[in-house]
């Protein structure tokens, strides 16, 4: 059922469909589902905010962590905090009420922050892939990834993310409640007159999904070939090769995590867009959308688990300058992030 600034996934043959901005949507699913949704968002908030804030705080406190590669990783933490503060808190509040009680303004803000976080994450992973390709494969001789390049990379991620998330705020497409009507996203559902949803969705999928994914797959495809060649030729020391492999492994796992979280949502969104008017239940979009939101906690978790130096610095921060697990954290100086300035293979 389509209405002004909303689309409820139910045929209004019984006349029970109401605006998700004004009435509880308990006719869509059992009211308990809204409580579960709210509890899930609360979990993401109490986990996502501390780990992302700690990632920022520890990096700013410890000078040795302020490497060019870490600028991009910090950018991911900032994006996740935007999702937690601007998106998750709003969705938890609306879930508790059973409808989007904050109105259109709240919907625009929630949709904007949630989409912004996802876009910054994807473009950050594309920049990381380019960094790994340039550092490891050396397509440009004597090139060193430095602070200026990292700042340019961060600026690119924000520029591209804003190019995707601002248009719906100013009339090219729009943000509307989706699924159980407690969170908002791009309007994939309607051909609302005056909003040009079709052209925006095509622009979004081509320029802000296909392009960064193509960059990621190209860079890592070249990188894998180069790593195999280097291993066969033994052109660099084992320590250098191992450090580069560890950094690359961490970034690849982040990419896989992003795809696991966001690919189901993107696939469902594309299906809805190409099958407008087809019947589907509220959970069809709700489950992928809320699964995608879990991406706000996996990036810092991967970073903490796979980076010895950062883990060591975080523990010393938490324990007031001491590391009670010093023996387990030995070798922290051989870091994954410091390895970003090294190269382990010959030019690709």
Curated annotation (Swiss-Prot):
Task: Detail the disulphide connectivity of this chain as listed in its UniProt entry.
Answer: 107-184
As for membrane topology, the entry says: Multi-pass membrane protein
Swiss-Prot/TrEMBL keywords: Cell projection, Chromophore, Disulfide bond, G-protein coupled receptor, Glycoprotein, Lipoprotein, Membrane, Palmitate, Phosphoprotein, Photoreceptor protein, Receptor, Retinal protein, Sensory transduction, Transducer, Transmembrane, Transmembrane helix, Vision
User: How is it modified post-translationally?
Assistant: Phosphorylated on some or all of the serine and threonine residues present in the C-terminal region. Contains one covalently linked retinal chromophore.
- Annotated SUPFAM superfamilies: Family A G protein-coupled receptor-like
Q: Does the keyword Transmembrane helix apply?
A: yes
Chain positions covered by the region annotation Disordered: 327-348
Q: Which residues are glycosylated?
A: 12, 197
Instruction: Quote the residue positions with lipidation, kind S-palmitoyl cysteine.
Output: 320
Q: Which residues lie on this side of the membrane: Cytoplasmic?
A: 59-70, 131-149, 222-249, 306-348
Q: Which GO terms describe its cellular component?
A: membrane; photoreceptor disc membrane; plasma membrane
Motif placement: 'Ionic lock' involved in activated form stabilization = 131-133
What are the recorded Gene Ontology BP terms? absorption of visible light; G protein-coupled opsin signaling pathway; visual perception
Residues bearing N6-(retinylidene)lysine are 293
> Where are the annotated coiled coils located?
none
Q: Where is the composition biased (Low complexity)?
A: 332-348
Which stretches are transmembrane?
Answer: 34-58, 71-93, 108-130, 150-170, 200-221, 250-271, 284-305
Top-rank lineage group of the source organism: Eukaryota
GO-annotated molecular function: 11-cis retinal binding; G protein-coupled photoreceptor activity
What InterPro entries has UniProt attached to this entry? Answer: GPCR_opsins, GPCR_Rhodpsn, GPCR_Rhodpsn_7TM, Opsin, Retinal_BS, Rhodopsin, Rhodopsin_N
Q: In this UniProt entry, which residues form the Extracellular topological domain(s)? A: 1-33, 94-107, 171-199, 272-283
Q: Does the keyword Lipoprotein apply?
A: yes
Q: Which family does it belong to?
A: Belongs to the G-protein coupled receptor 1 family. Opsin subfamily.
Summarizing the function annotation, the protein's role is:
Photoreceptor required for image-forming vision at low light intensity. While most salt water fish species use retinal as chromophore, most freshwater fish use 3-dehydroretinal, or a mixture of retinal and 3-dehydroretinal. Light-induced isomerization of 11-cis to all-trans retinal triggers a conformational change that activates signaling via G-proteins. Subsequent receptor phosphorylation mediates displacement of the bound G-protein alpha subunit by arrestin and terminates signaling.
What name appears for this protein in its UniProt entry? Answer: Rhodopsin
Lineage of producing organism: Eukaryota, Metazoa, Chordata, Craniata, Vertebrata
The gene for this chain is: rho
């Amino acid at each position: 059922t389509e209405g002004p600034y909303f689309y409820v996934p139910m045929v209004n043959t019984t006349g029970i469909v109401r605006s998700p901005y004004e009435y509880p949507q308990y006719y869509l699913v059992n009211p308990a589902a809204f409580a579960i949704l709210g509890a899930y968002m609360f979990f993401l908030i109490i986990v996502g905010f501390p780990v992302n804030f700690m990632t920022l705080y520890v990096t700013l406190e410890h000078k040795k962590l302020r490497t060019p590669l870490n600028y991009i990783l910090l950018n991911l933490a900032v994006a996740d905090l935007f999702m937690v503060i601007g998106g998750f808190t709003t969705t938890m509040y609306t879930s508790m009420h059973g409808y989007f009680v904050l109105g259109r303004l709240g919907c625009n803000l929630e949709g904007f922050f949630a989409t912004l976080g996802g876009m910054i994450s994807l473009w950050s992973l594309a920049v990381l892939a380019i960094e790994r390709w340039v550092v490891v494969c050396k397509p440009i001789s004597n090139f060193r990834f430095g602070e200026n390049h990292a700042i340019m990379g961060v600026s690119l991620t924000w520029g591209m993310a804003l190019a995707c998330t601002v248009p719906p705020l100013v009339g090219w497409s729009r943000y509307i409640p989706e699924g159980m009507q407690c969170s908002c996203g791009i309007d994939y559902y309607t051909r609302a007159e005056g909003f040009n949803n079709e052209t925006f969705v095509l622009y979004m999928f081509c320029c802000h999904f296909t392009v960064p994914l193509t960059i990621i797959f190209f860079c890592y495809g070249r990188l894998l070939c180069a790593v195999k060649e280097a291993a066969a030729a033994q052109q660099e020391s084992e320590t250098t090769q191992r450090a580069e492999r560890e950094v690359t492994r961490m970034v690849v796992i982040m990419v896989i995590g992003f795809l696991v979280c966001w690919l189901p949502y993107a696939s469902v969104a594309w299906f809805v867009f190409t099958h407008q008017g087809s019947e589907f239940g509220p959970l069809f979009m709700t489950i992928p959308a809320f699964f995608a939101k879990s991406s706000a906690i996996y990036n810092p978790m991967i970073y903490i688990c796979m980076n010895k130096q950062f883990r060591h610095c975080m523990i010393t921060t938490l324990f007031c300058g001491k590391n009670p697990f010093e023996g387990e954290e030995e070798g922290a100086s051989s870091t994954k992030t410091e390895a970003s300035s090294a190269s382990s293979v010959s030019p690709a």
